[in-house]
Amino acid sequence: MKVTSSRLIEQKKPILKQLLDRLLQTYSYASILMTDSKGKQYTISKQGISITENMFVELGYVVKVYDGESYGEYAFSHIDENEIDSVAEEIKNHVMPWAKKLPDDMKVKQYPEIPDEAYHFEKSTDYEVLPEELGDEEIVKRLGAVREKAMAQDEKIVEIKTACVYQIYHKLFLSPNKDMTQNVMWTNGMIMGLIPKGEEMKMAFDSCSGCGGMEILDDMETKIPPLVQKLNDLATSEPITPGEYDCICAPDVTGMIVHEAFGHGVEMDMFVKKRALAEKYIGEYVASPLVTMHDGAAAASETATFFLMMREHLRRIPSSLIKES
């Protein structure tokens, strides 16, 4: 099934279109982004059961306008039809005159107008089990069953913690030539265990994630055997002798290393400060010729998946951070 659209966005869209028309009377370019989301986090451990709101939920609006020289943005959390003029006046009187407040020795950099190719769509991700239909009680029951099953695997295990978090978010983007809506649901599942090793406590962790609903609870059960194996391996493990080693990593570990080293390592401030070691490896071999690492919202159906971009065609093309090593 597809994630349905937001009723609030459907209600506010005609008002936002009126606001856009009002802004375009003053500015050559204007756009409006609306976000409406909801979600919960469930956690079960020895300490008890916790149900909280997902920390990433949000509701609000952002307007961007261009005055022929620079851009200004204005964020607000509520709008009705009788507030259209007041929002437009707030932008005109308090947002765009920002350049007048600059020191005399500072100049305003001129920016070109954003290309506004025509795109009109509404896209949604798929799911099998809607969290709200399953209900809090059943979700907690299923998470508790996963925890109890994991605890029963080995009497040496002193704690198992299970958690599940989901978010359903909706975004609407309007500009003179764009009318784009996305409806996305993502879910994360986590299972963590503790086992003693002498006076130490060793911890193992596993997780699953993706676009979808509470069908992820089935995936969490499959994480129990490897988690228990990790815990037992850690309980009998010995520290590695300090030194330099050539390591063969699992793909998920390699991905994390590449993210940290070549993602954060190529941030512009690191280049300017001559702190980016990655600068020396651009164009060089950094992995096996078998390795190609993709990036971008279209690379996988995951928690970072999205459809809505200023230039939507770019989203459909996964970029390659590493191509054939």
Q: Regions from the language model: what does each represent?
A:
Residues 1-305, 313-316, 323-324:
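Active-site bordering "gate/hinge" segments
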Residues 310:
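Acidic, glycine-enriched loop/beta-strand segments at the rims
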